[in-house]
C-alpha cells in the first residue's frame, strides 16, 4: 500500500490541475455573463458574502467519478485505472479548451467581407462586399443569410441569400438560394446552391435561372441574365494551412452568351478556372485565378480579400497562428458560400425590322390584277424593297414610291398548256432599312385556276 500511494499521487495532482483549468474557464465565463455578481473589487463583504464551496464540490465529483470507474472490471489494477482516469480528464479539459478556442471565431454578428479584384485590363469587375449573418446556430444546424453588392461594368449587382448548414459526421453539408439583381439594368435571376465541406476539401454546385424577360440594351440589341451552372472543388493544404487551391467548371446556355464579359458572345460556352489563395493571417487573403474558355478566350484575375469577423479581437485576426483554426471545418461555418455573384449575360439581336407578305386569294384568273399587301415595321425607315421570285412573268408594278409598302400590284399571266407548265409562281421580298439591315419576308405561291375554254374537245364529249 505504501508503494501504491506515491505512484497514484502524481496522477491525482494532474487530475486536479485539469479540473482546475476547466473550473477556471467556467468561472471566467460566469464572470463575463454576470459581471455584477462577483465580489472581486477587494471591498469587505461585511459577513454577507456567501461561502463558495465550488472547489470542494469539484473535488468530490472527481472522487465520485473515479470510484465509479474503478468499480468496472476492465482487467486493470488500481494504479492503471487511476492513470487512465486522469488522462481522460486531461483530454476532456483540453478538448473543451480547443472547442472554446474555435467557437471564439464564431461571432453571432457574423463576418463582413470585402473582395477587391483586378482583371487583365485593370478593371475592378467582380469586386464585392458582403455580410454573412447567422440567424440561428446550435449543435444541430446553422441558418444564415447574406447580403452583398458586386461591381460590374453595367453597374452594381445586389445579392441576397439564405441557407442552412448542418454537420454530418466529418462533413458540413448545406443548401442555399439567392436572388441576384443587376440594379441599373433591372435584370434578375435566382440561384440555387448545394455544398459539402470536409476538413480539407470543399465541394459546391450552383444553378442559375433568369427571372426577367429580355430588356433593351441598345437600339439593335437585347439582353438578359443567362441560364447556367457551376461546379467548384476547393482544397486546403494539410501540410501548409495558408494555401488553398480550387478548380471550377461552369457552363451557360444561349446563342450569344458573354461568359468573359468581353463583348463577344458564344453558343453554350464552357470555361474551366484554376485558382490559388494565400492567407497569411485570417483577416487577409490574396487570390489569383486563371479562366480558360473552349473558344480560346481566357482571363486572369488578381484579388485581395479582407474578411473581418465581428466580435473577434483584431489581434487574433492578424495572427498567423490562428489561420488553421479559422479555416478548420468548425471555425469556417460562417464562411461565404462558393458561388458566382457576378451574373453572366446573354444577348440577342433586337427585332427593329420585320416584314410580312399576305397571301392573295386562291382562285386567281389569267390577266387578273392582284394587289400585294405588305406589313412592314421598321424603326429606321425603309431604304428599298428587293423582290425575289418570278417577278418578270408576274408583271410586278410598284406604287407611287418604290421604297413604300403601299401600291404594289402584279398581273397574273395567261394559262400555259405546254409540257412542264405548272401555272404556279412564287414571290417574296427583302426589305432594307436606312441602317443597312435586311430582313426577308415569307414566300407566297400564286396559282391560276384552269379556265373553262382551256379544256379539250375530248374532255367536253358526252357519252350516253
Curated annotation (Swiss-Prot):
GO cellular component: cell outer membrane; periplasmic space
Annotated disulfide bonds: none
Gene3D superfamilies documented for this protein: Inverse autotransporter, beta-domain (2.40.160.160)
A Pfam family this chain is assigned to: IAT_beta
Signal recorded as keyword: yes
Alphabetically ordered keywords of this record: Periplasm, Signal
Signal peptide boundaries: 1-24
Keyword Phosphoprotein part of the UniProt annotation: no
Residues in coiled coil: none
Compartments in which it is found: Periplasm
InterPro entries: IAT_beta, IAT_beta_sf, Intimin-Invasin_domain
Family the UniProt entry places it in: Belongs to the intimin/invasin family.
This protein's name: Uncharacterized protein YchO
Lineage: Bacteria, Pseudomonadati, Pseudomonadota, Gammaproteobacteria, Enterobacterales
Name of the encoding gene: ychO
Amino acid at each position: 500500500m505504501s508503494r501504491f500511494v506515491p505512484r497514484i499521487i502524481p496522477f491525482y495532482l494532474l487530475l486536479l490541475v485539469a479540473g482546475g483549468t476547466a473550473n477556471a474557464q467556467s468561472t471566467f465565463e460566469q464572470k463575463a455573463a454576470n459581471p455584477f455578481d462577483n465580489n472581486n473589487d477587494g471591498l469587505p463583504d461585511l459577513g454577507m458574502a456567501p461561502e463558495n464551496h465550488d472547489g470542494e464540490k469539484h473535488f468530490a465529483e472527481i472522487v465520485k467519478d473515479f470510484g465509479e470507474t474503478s468499480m468496472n472490471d476492465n482487467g486493470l489494477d488500481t494504479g492503471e485505472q487511476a492513470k487512465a482516469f486522469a488522462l481522460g480528464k486531461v483530454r476532456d479539459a483540453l478538448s473543451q479548451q480547443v472547442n472554446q478556442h474555435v467557437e471564439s471565431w464564431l461571432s453571432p454578428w457574423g463576418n463582413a467581407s470585402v473582395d477587391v479584384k483586378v482583371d487583365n485590363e485593370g478593371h475592378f469587375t467582380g469586386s464585392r462586399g458582403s455580410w454573412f449573418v447567422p440567424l440561428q446556430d446550435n449543435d444541430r444546424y446553422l441558418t444564415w443569410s447574406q447580403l452583398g453588392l458586386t461591381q460590374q461594368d453595367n453597374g452594381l449587382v445586389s445579392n441576397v441569400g439564405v441557407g442552412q448548414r448542418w454537420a454530418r459526421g466529418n462533413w458540413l453539408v448545406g443548401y442555399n438560394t439567392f436572388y441576384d439583381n443587376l440594379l441599373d439594368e433591372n435584370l434578375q435571376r435566382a440561384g440555387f446552391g448545394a455544398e459539402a465541406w470536409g476538413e480539407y476539401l470543399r465541394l459546391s454546385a450552383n444553378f442559375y435561372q433568369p427571372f426577367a424577360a429580355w430588356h433593351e440594351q441598345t437600339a439593335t440589341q437585347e439582353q438578359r441574365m443567362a441560364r447556367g451552372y457551376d461546379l467548384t472543388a476547393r482544397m486546403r493544404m494539410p501540410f501548409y494551412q495558408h494555401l488553398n487551391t480550387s478548380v471550377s467548371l461552369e457552363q451557360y446556355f444561349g446563342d450569344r452568351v458573354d461568359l468573359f464579359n468581353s463583348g463577344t458572345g458564344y453558343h453554350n460556352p464552357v470555361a474551366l478556372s484554376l485558382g490559388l489563395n494565400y492567407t497569411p493571417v485570417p483577416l487577409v487573403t490574396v487570390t489569383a485565378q486563371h479562366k480558360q474558355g473552349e473558344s480560346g478566350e481566357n482571363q486572369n484575375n488578381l484579388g485581395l480579400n479582407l474578411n473581418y469577423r465581428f466580435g473577434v479581437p483584431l489581434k487574433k485576426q492578424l495572427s498567423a497562428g490562428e489561420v488553421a483554426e479559422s479555416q478548420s471545418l468548425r471555425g469556417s461555418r460562417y464562411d461565404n458560400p462558393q458561388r458566382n455573384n457576378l451574373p453572366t449575360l446573354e444577348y440577342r439581336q433586337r427585332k427593329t425590322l420585320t416584314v410580312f407578305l399576305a397571301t392573295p386569294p386562291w382562285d386567281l384568273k389569267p390577266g387578273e390584277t392582284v394587289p400585294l399587301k405588305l406589313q412592314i415595321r421598321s424603326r429606321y425607315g425603309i431604304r428599298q424593297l428587293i423582290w425575289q421570285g418570278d417577278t418578270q412573268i408576274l408583271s410586278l408594278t410598284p406604287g407611287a414610291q418604290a421604297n413604300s409598302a403601299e401600291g404594289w400590284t402584279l398581273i397574273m399571266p395567261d394559262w400555259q398548256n405546254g409540257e412542264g407548265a405548272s401555272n404556279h409562281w412564287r414571290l417574296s421580298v427583302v426589305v432594307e432599312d436606312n441602317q443597312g439591315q435586311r430582313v426577308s419576308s415569307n414566300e407566297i405561291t400564286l396559282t391560276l385556276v384552269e379556265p373553262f375554254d382551256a379544256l379539250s374537245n375530248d374532255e367536253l364529249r358526252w357519252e350516253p
